[in-house]
């Protein structure tokens, strides 16, 4: 049926040329950027600023040795690699802090899930605790590890 109609009513050739001209103008690539040679982000954005260190409490010459990492967002509807990283870091339970070393391999894993976690430096105002005092330490929400001193009772001397 379509063949009969085409033979009965041929299209004028001028109309086809108009469509071609319109198609060429749409296909034209002068509005597309072909080369990505220059970065759109200025280099000064990536340079460290002293205000950042004051704001976040870091010292670039003496970085902290340990991180306190807390998961603050859910892993539901997140990709499997983020869930695997959260499990690897031991952050399955939300709002329970974990302590990790400040080394490049751990920092690379933290960078993958940085939008799901909070990272704080571990502050040791009383120094690193020993094995005996490890059981009597308390981790504050500010990131300080405080050793709770237990008072030993004074032995009463027997009255003579």
Curated annotation (Swiss-Prot):
GO terms for biological process: mitochondrial translation. CDD domains: Ribosomal_L30 (cd01658). GO terms for molecular function: structural constituent of ribosome. The keyword Transferase does not apply. Residues 1-34 form a transit peptide. The keyword 4Fe-4S does not apply. It is found in: Mitochondrion. One of its GO terms (cellular component) is mitochondrial inner membrane. Keywords: Mitochondrion, Ribonucleoprotein, Ribosomal protein, Transit peptide. Its main location: mitochondrion. Component of the mitochondrial ribosome large subunit (39S) which comprises a 16S rRNA and about 50 distinct proteins. PANTHER family: LARGE RIBOSOMAL SUBUNIT PROTEIN UL30M (PTHR15892:SF2), MITOCHONDRIAL RIBOSOMAL PROTEIN L30 (PTHR15892). Belongs to the universal ribosomal protein uL30 family. This is Large ribosomal subunit protein uL30m. It comes from Mus musculus. The gene is Mrpl30.
């Amino acid at each position: 049926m379509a063949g009969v109609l085409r033979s009965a009513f041929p299209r004028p050739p001028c109309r086809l040329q108009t469509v071609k001209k319109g198609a060429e103008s749409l296909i034209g690539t002068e509005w597309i950027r072909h080369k990505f040679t220059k970065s759109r982000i200025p280099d000064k954005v990536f340079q460290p600023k002293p205000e950042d260190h004051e704001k976040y409490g870091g010292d670039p010459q003496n970085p902290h040795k340990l991180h306190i990492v807390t998961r603050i967002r859910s892993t539901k509807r997140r990709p499997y690699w983020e869930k695997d990283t959260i499990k690897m870091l031991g952050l399955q339970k939300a709002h329970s802090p974990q302590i990790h070393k400040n080394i490049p391999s751990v920092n690379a894993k933290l960078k993958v899930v940085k939008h799901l976690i909070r990272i704080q430096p571990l502050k040791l105002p009383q120094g690193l605790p020993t094995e005996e005092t490890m059981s009597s330490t308390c981790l504050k929400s500010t990131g300080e590890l405080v050793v709770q001193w237990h008072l030993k009772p004074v032995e009463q001397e027997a009255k003579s």
